[in-house]
Amino acid sequence: MRSPPEPRTTPAPVAVTAIPRTIPAPVSPPKPAPVSTPEPLAIKRVLDIGPIKFGDYAWDTKNVPAGPVVITVDLAAQTLSVFRGGYEIGAAAILYGTDDKPTPLGSFPITMKDADHVSSIYDAPMPYTLRLTDDGVSVHGTEVAWGYATHGCIGVPTAFAKLLFGEAKVGDRVIITRGKSLATGETLIG
């Protein structure tokens, strides 16, 4: 006769204790950054330069503190003015678009800067370009002479464009009007 098989030695069941872990609290979705509302910018100084002729410009940053830059363009007066912290630091005679290719009115942020830009449409140099619109309207250097016009851009004397290019940043505002000029004490939205 055979002897009964030896019982197998199976380990006894072991109780497993769960290790407590901290479950992070649900993360709320990120909130969008607050959108800044442009602050009104008071005009504190206008350059005392008299009438500007085609090709002329003025630039004076002496004793002007740092501050936000706002560029205004008056198509009726054919002038561009540069304000830093409310002080006019530059002004120039401009060229602008024709009836067929008009310069748009409104407030535009500078979206791109390119010191050596060449138009992909007209194969023309556009030195010191400050791009304003997706379809290519820009402020740029050119020969500013009576009888000339642009295809919608704002042309300024090239030497002035270089100074403006050094002062302006992407995001700075360019306000284009037809017949609205600013005087000391007035405000504009930057």
Enumerate the predicted regions with their spans.
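Cell wall/extracellular polymer interaction/catalysis modules
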Residues: 5-98
